[in-house]
Each structure stands twice: as structure tokens, then as C-alpha cells.
UniProtKB/Swiss-Prot annotation:
PTM description: Phosphorylated. Phosphorylation inhibits activation of tubulin polymerization.
Broad class of the protein's primary localization: secreted
Residue list for modification Phosphothreonine: 113
PANTHER family listed in its UniProt record: PROTEIN S100-A9, S100 CALCIUM-BINDING PROTEIN
Modified residues annotated as Pros-methylhistidine in this record: 105
Name of the protein in its database record: Protein S100-A9
Tissues where the protein occurs: Calprotectin (S100A8/9) is predominantly expressed in myeloid cells. Except for inflammatory conditions, the expression is restricted to a specific stage of myeloid differentiation since both proteins are expressed in circulating neutrophils and monocytes but are absent in normal tissue macrophages and lymphocytes. Under chronic inflammatory conditions, such as psoriasis and malignant disorders, also expressed in the epidermis.
Annotated function: S100A9 is a calcium- and zinc-binding protein which plays a prominent role in the regulation of inflammatory processes and immune response. It can induce neutrophil chemotaxis, adhesion, can increase the bactericidal activity of neutrophils by promoting phagocytosis via activation of SYK, PI3K/AKT, and ERK1/2 and can induce degranulation of neutrophils by a MAPK-dependent mechanism. Predominantly found as calprotectin (S100A8/A9) which has a wide plethora of intra- and extracellular functions.
Stretch list, region Disordered: 93-114
Residues with the Blocked amino end (Thr) modification: 2
Localisation per UniProt entry: Secreted; Cytoplasm; Cytoplasm, Cytoskeleton; Cell membrane
UniProt source species: Homo sapiens (Human)
Listed GO biological process terms: antimicrobial humoral immune response mediated by antimicrobial peptide; apoptotic process; astrocyte development; autocrine signaling; autophagy; cell-cell signaling; chronic inflammatory response; defense response to bacterium
Amino acid sequence: MTCKMSQLERNIETIINTFHQYSVKLGHPDTLNQGEFKELVRKDLQNFLKKENKNEKVIEHIMEDLDTNADKQLSFEEFIMLMARLTWASHEKMHEGDEGPGHHHKPGLGEGTP
């Protein structure tokens, strides 16, 4: 009998599968080179990184910041730090200006006005 995955578990699988969708294109199949990373950011993070996508140098800087071992590639471990940062930033945006009792959510990153 197969257990049905929760939404969170499916979302984790989606992150892994998306990473591999790009990482297998060139070079080592389990790392993202600069071109693969740029393509992933442009296609799959176009709303979360709207401003950053307009400037190629900014995307390069993001990769350099994530590339902790300076090998010009991103391992999954390095890439997942971007996912963690974006998740945190989106959560913070949802609570921006949220004061007082209760728990309210506004649109996060990639939501709201274009």
C-alpha cells in the first residue's frame, strides 16, 4: 500500500526535481553551472526574483554568494540555501507591517501586483 504524500512533501520533491531538470544539462549532472542557474532563475523564479532577473550581474552575484566552495558551480546543498532564503523573505513579506493580535498574511514574494 502506497502512502499519499502531503503537499509539503510534494513541494520538497518539486524543488529536487526542478534542480535536477537544470543540473543534468551540462557538466556534472548533480551541480548547476552558471548558465543552468541563470536559466533556472529566469524560468522558475521569475516572480520571486523579478527585480534580480532584469540584471544579469545581480544573478551572477547571487550565484557567487551561494557558491560557498568557489568552484563556479552550485551543489544541491548550496542551491537549497537560496530556497531557504526565498522562503524566509516571502514569509517576512507576508507579515510586513503586521502589528497587533492575530495572524494575518498579505501576499508573499511573487504575489500581488506585477
